[in-house]
Amino acid sequence: NCRDIGGYETRDGRKVQTGLIYRSGELPRLTDEDMEKLRALGVKTVVNFLTPEEVEYRGKDRLPEGVREIILPITGEIDDVPDAAAQLVEARKTGDFRKFPPAFNTQVHKDLVTGVADEQYSALFEILADKSNYPLVYHCSHGVHRTGTATALLLHALNVPWDTVRMDYLLSNETRRAEVEPRIEQLEGLAASRPMSDTDQKENSEAIRAFYLLQPDYIDASRDGAVEKYGSLDKYLEKGLGLNDLKIENLRDLSTAPQN
């Protein structure tokens, strides 16, 4: 699920530049061919949102020599699930997703913009404000919840329409299809061996599918959460992340350009 966020048109007729900013899922299992692709892209900086527990479970990022890695772990309590990232590591081991019902997926996106990840997202924007950090990759485990919300905030800051932001978010369903379908089957198989009633098995299967198959209301919940707390997404960027008009203008100058 690694892809360029560039190419999108902005409301003021500019275009997000390609070859500068990439969003991704985990990077520990890169093949030699993948490493060569990163080298060819000239990636200088990788921002990693994974927690220490996730890194222990998944492994450290495998990166070309000379790439700077910045660790900004996003953890915390989400939807009344203490230390949700660690709990998800366990769910992925056992196939038991009953602590993460379908409603979790909208709540996690809302929580990410109402306190859980403000410090990390603010730091990401500071990194993006420095041209010497480009080209840059930021990632979490699957490139979906934490990375998807970060991308939505970034594209919004670059003046990309929300319909386009939503489309980019849902694109992960296509880019991850070959990975997700067998993963769902594997998790359902793990869960089937656990002592659950038929009703619990059905609810657990629904939770697994809701977690791995993205819906538009997930990313809309990030926008709605910011609106509920701050009044607008722009106000969240300003008050929650410390992005004033000058910083946003600088970011747009760095990563958007007039269309030919």
Protein language model regions, located:
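Cys-dependent protein tyrosine phosphatase-like superfamily
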Residues: 1-137, 142, 150-260
